[in-house]
Amino acid sequence: MALKTFKPYTKSTRGTILVDRNGLWKGKPFKSLVSPKNAMKGRNNNGHITSINRAGGHKKMYRHVDFYRKKFDMTAVVERIEYDPNRSCYIMLVKFDDNSHSYYLAPQKIKVGDKIINGSKKEIKIGNCMPLQDIPVGIDIHNVEIQPGGGGKIARSAGTSVTISGLDGNYSLIKLASGEVRKIDSRSLATIGVLSNPDQKNIKIGKAGRSRWLGRRPHTRGVVKNPVDHPHGGGEGKTAGGRHPVSPTGQSAKGLKTRDNKRTDKFIVR
């Protein structure tokens, strides 16, 4: 997919850059694989704001994407590639030999009519899913399970992938996009290929209204708030905040390591 630009007929089109979705399915989603989605709008079950700057947004139907890929040794044909408003990459509708359908994450270079399969010792082909122990070192993969049978958790957003950098006993060494190398059970499943829509990172929203369609509210700086609302608030006239940058709850915003899971530290190589 390519990017599309707009002539500056209005202020909102000046500088706007969006992804051209002409090649995607233009109809409705597959009815049995969607359900209504109740938007939380940044609130918890008490109605209190737990994630600031979120509200509204266009109503979305949730597409039930299969991250587990448990239908082994059964060929599936890609029927169509669709836009999914709930994630940044595209999804594909596949039809199995038993006439059942599933939604999968769509990798780059996959086309309508391509055949894919899940299972052990299958062909190294874009869209095929297999255990890590059957994938050669250096191959780009996505939708990687952390625990065998737990469903894909790693590399699920637009244009992302990870690579196998080596083996360590019963574990595969996976190099993440951040540069981190992590040990994952070699029986865990992964899918071959890089995920679709790599130009997602290059879009420019162009206007405030498009942010509201996405469910994003305006972001107010802490230094212009009152002391009751933010640690940087208050002061006579324009102030610098008086302390190192922090979040509204007082947590350091610059470089504080927030990971606190000693149980899984042993799986992080570097």
Q: Predicted segments — roles?
A:
Residues 1-87, 108-270:
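Basic, glycine/proline-rich low-complexity segments that contact nucleic acids
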Residues 86, 94-96:
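Structural recognition of beta-strand segments within beta-rich domains
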Residues 92-93, 172:
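Short, hydrophobic/aromatic-rich beta-strand segments within well-structured domains
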Residues 96-99, 177-178:
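Short acidic-glycine loop/turn motifs at beta-strand connectors
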Residues 99-111:
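Beta-strand/loop nucleic-acid-binding surfaces
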